[in-house]
Design a protein with these regions (language model features):
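Structured, basic alpha/beta domains of bacterial-type, RNA-associated proteins
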Residues: 1-23, 27-108
């Protein structure tokens, strides 16, 4: 049975977190946590928290083998955007997009 954890509306762009999710997909949970611990990215901290939450969900729901849990799904989807205007020369304005993402991790 798969145990899942989600972080909706994470305040980071999905393109920054997706490569980290690709690193841990298919790994055992302890190994994936070790990989994320030594990544120098802010998204690694977020992904690490979601992975720990998925492991805690498995423990809480009575998973039979906690030592052999594997990451079966690590998905990062795009979320909503805040749009801000940055004043530019000659009365113009450029749109600055503050991107959000949804981080989903399943272990089995």
């Amino acid at each position: 049975m798969a145990y899942q954890a989600k972080h909706k509306h994470a305040r980071i762009s999905a393109t920054k977190v997706r490569p980290l999710a690709n690193l841990i997909r298919g790994q055992e949970v302890d190994e994936a946590l070790a990989i994320l611990k030594y990544q120098p990215h802010r998204g690694a901290r977020m992904l690490e928290k979601v992975l720990k939450s998925a492991r805690a969900n498995a423990e809480d729901r009575g998973a039979p083998n906690l030592g052999g849990l594997r990451v079966v799904e690590a998905r990062v989807d795009g979320g909503p955007m805040f749009k801000r205007l940055r004043p530019r020369a000659r009365g113009m304005a450029h749109v600055i997009k503050k991107k959000f993402s949804h981080i989903i991790v399943s272990v089995e």
